Amino acid sequence: MAVTNLPTCDGLFIISLIVIVSSIFGTSSAQLNATFYSGTCPNASAIVRSTIQQALQSDTRIGASLIRLHFHDCFVNGCDASILLDDTGSIQSEKNAGPNVNSARGFNVVDNIKTALENACPGVVSCSDVLALASEASVSLAGGPSWTVLLGRRDSLTANLAGANSSIPSPIESLSNITFKFSAVGLNTNDLVALSGAHTFGRARCGVFNNRLFNFSGTGNPDPTLNSTLLSTLQQLCPQNGSASTITNLDLSTPDAFDNNYFANLQSNDGLLQSDQELFSTTGSSTIAIVTSFASNQTLFFQAFAQSMINMGNISPLTGSNGEIRLDCKKVNGS
């Protein structure tokens, strides 16, 4: 997975950026509402949920994959379904970006959802709203919280490959870099920890954590924050010069359930990804107290996660006459 660190900026620039971004979000997100499709496609949420239920019968990973698509979409020019666009003569697909290539998945299920929605309500529900609805349904179906999904997003007319390479947080980045990337889109530290809790289900490839197993940060030794028992298991699964595509569970204890075990894992140094473990192992970080509170109180985590998903879904949506309602999520209309 490619890692591109954002250039360092002085504090005044960062504060100004956050103020500007926050003011934009306040205007855009206010146009989203929970009843947007009540008169035009009242069964939209039920259609999304039933399609995912069907997909789960043959792919237990699909819920985690769908929420990851929403996350990677929102961090690049906002929640506009740009991640779903294929390459064309004029569009460089975000699917080819380092954080997405050979790892982003679930596009076929998005297409199935969109087909079902088009059959019921032609030209009404946007692909960006499909991702938002699919994320809520995926979490709920895995035993996690439900929340009111705000709707009314429209779809982008292009993609941003460079933005996908630079803006999406990487599992091998430092906590400070990831915190900056969250701040750049108007999300705070509580959002960072809560949304990281989505790693309570799903899988990860050896290629995104094998940097911790043998030669961490050029030391010639494994990551010292990695539990020795887990380290031994992972070294066997992902040997040096082995396949980077081998997958394992993000949460070893309850891999397909949405719960707060992810945070307990961090407390015992059983976080799979560097970016996860740093939430608890970075000395003096404010994230430690948040991890501790979520580990001891699942209800608190669920409440925070639901709110943070709403916050993330409010990142720079296209509304009104901006963008379009794609008829096929893979391509802009008329192409």
From Swiss-Prot:
Binding-site positions, Ca(2+) 2: 200, 251, 254, 259
Active site: 72
Protein EC: 1.11.1.7
Biological process (GO), any one: defense response to nematode
Domain of life of the native organism: Eukaryota
Note on cofactor: Binds 2 calcium ions per subunit. Binds 1 heme b (iron(II)-protoporphyrin IX) group per subunit.
Enzyme type, top EC level: oxidoreductase
Residues the entry annotates as binding heme b: 199
Xref: InterPro entries: Haem_peroxidase (IPR002016), Haem_peroxidase_sf (IPR010255), Peroxidase_pln (IPR000823), Peroxidases_AS (IPR019794), Peroxidases_heam-ligand_BS (IPR019793), Secretory_peroxidase (IPR033905)
MF GO annotations: heme binding; lactoperoxidase activity; metal ion binding
Cofactor dependency: Ca(2+); heme b
Signal peptide: 1-30
Residues that, per the record, bind substrate: 169
Tissue-by-tissue expression: Mainly expressed in roots.
Pyrrolidone carboxylic acid: residues bearing it: 31
Disulfide cysteine pairs (residue numbers): 41-121, 74-79, 127-329, 206-238
Annotated residues for binding of Ca(2+) 1: 73, 76, 78, 80, 82
Keyword annotations of the record: Calcium, Disulfide bond, Glycoprotein, Heme, Hydrogen peroxide, Iron, Metal-binding, Oxidoreductase, Peroxidase, Pyrrolidone carboxylic acid, Secreted, Signal
Glycosylation site residues: 33, 43, 165, 177, 215, 227, 241, 297
The keyword Phosphoprotein appears for this protein: no
Site (Transition state stabilizer): 68
Catalysis performed (reactions): 2 a phenolic donor + H2O2 = 2 a phenolic radical donor + 2 H2O
Protein function: Removal of H(2)O(2), oxidation of toxic reductants, biosynthesis and degradation of lignin, suberization, auxin catabolism, response to environmental stresses such as wounding, pathogen attack and oxidative stress. These functions might be dependent on each isozyme/isoform in each plant tissue.
Family statement: Belongs to the peroxidase family. Classical plant (class III) peroxidase subfamily.
Note in the entry: There are 73 peroxidase genes in A.thaliana.
Name of this chain's protein: Peroxidase 53
